[in-house]
């Protein structure tokens, strides 16, 4: 069997617990103060910086994952909010200073000749262009607000056969051949979602206002153009996206309509109902290769074992670490 060894850190303490900004500040200070007097020193500096970034990103990711899985858990909510409001804002100016230190180092131009580093350097320069001190507070606010949609949608469930089920699980009933069942479940789902319309509208209005302010602070006319640059869309333009949209409308939409008409004919219907989109048009029962999350995982591990034991080893390790949340999906 394949054994996956945990990555051993060389810069950040393996036992580090991020419970305050001060817990990571010493590593940031070491990076800021280190003398980059050779290309080898610069490479090591980048490696150490990358390791610290990975540690921080993983810590925040787990806070977000736990909060998303258990939306009613106030401790998980507080842990995520603490990171994005107390730690992230203090990281932002130091991250900008580290980017400036990197670009100011004369050896970075030698690294730029290597493709992998060229891509990274391009991203760093873009981050420097986007950084505005006045946006730190806005970004913290946005990080906190954007998770609210997940909290709202994650709390949604319906009653079916005397049982409270998640929206993901309810969606499976839309594949059943019994139209009365599909219609009933769909209407319950729609009613539940409708009850959150006012809250979601308010949230969306707030996000639009703050995102527009963020973009204008950075010198952009709108948030779309700002986000395009922030996400590193270097190899194509927004005009390329518009052209793609036009192509989809011209070539794909007619195909989808044709497929829908063929589905209608097979179902002996004249118009689509919203609960008809997932059901098998030929009257076949939905496939049920597994009943539980454990069955799904065990089956996947068995298949991956035949393909490559390394793949199944990854899944086994993730299972041991309790990194799966399959039942609710």
Regions found by a protein language model. Name each.
Residues 282-329:
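Auxiliary, metal-adjacent structural segments of Zn-dependent hydrolase domains
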Residues 2-289, 299:
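A well-structured
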């Amino acid at each position: 069997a394949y054994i996956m060894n945990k990555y051993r850190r060389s810069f950040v303490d393996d036992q580090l617990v991020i419970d305050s900004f001060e817990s990571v500040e010493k590593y940031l200070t070491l990076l800021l103060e280190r003398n980059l007097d050779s290309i080898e020193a610069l490479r090591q500096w980048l490696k150490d910086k990358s390791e610290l970034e990975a540690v921080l990103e993983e810590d925040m990711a787990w806070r977000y994952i736990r909060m998303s899985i258990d939306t009613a858990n106030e401790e998980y909510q507080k842990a995520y909010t603490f990171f994005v409001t107390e730690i992230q804002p203090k990281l932002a100016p130091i991250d900008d200073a580290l980017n400036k230190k990197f670009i100011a180092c004369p050896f970075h131009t030698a690294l730029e000749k290597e493709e992998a580093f060229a891509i990274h350097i391009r991203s760093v320069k873009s981050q420097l262009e986007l950084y505005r001190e006045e946006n730190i507070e806005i970004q913290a606010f946005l990080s906190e607000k954007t998770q609210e949609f997940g909290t709202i949608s994650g709390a949604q469930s319906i009653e079916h056969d005397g049982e409270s089920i998640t929206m993901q699980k309810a969606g499976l009933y839309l594949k059943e051949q019994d139209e009365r069942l599909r219609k009933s479940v769909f209407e319950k789902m729609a009613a539940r979602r409708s009850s959150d319309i006012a809250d979601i509208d308010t949230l969306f209005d707030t996000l639009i206002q703050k995102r527009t302010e963020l973009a204008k602070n950075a010198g952009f006319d709108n948030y779309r153009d700002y986000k395009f640059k922030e996400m590193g869309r270097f190899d194509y333009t927004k005009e390329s996206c518009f052209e793609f949209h036009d192509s989809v409308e011209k070539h794909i939409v007619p195909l989808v309509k044709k497929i829908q008409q063929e589905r209608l004919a097979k179902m002996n219907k004249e118009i689509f109902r919203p609960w008809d989109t997932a059901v098998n048009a030929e009257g076949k029962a939905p496939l049920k290769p597994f009943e539980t999350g454990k069955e799904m995982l065990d089956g996947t591990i068995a298949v991956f074992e035949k393909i490559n034991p390394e793949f199944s080893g990854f899944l086994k390790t993730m299972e041991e670490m309790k990194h799966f949340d399959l039942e609710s999906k």
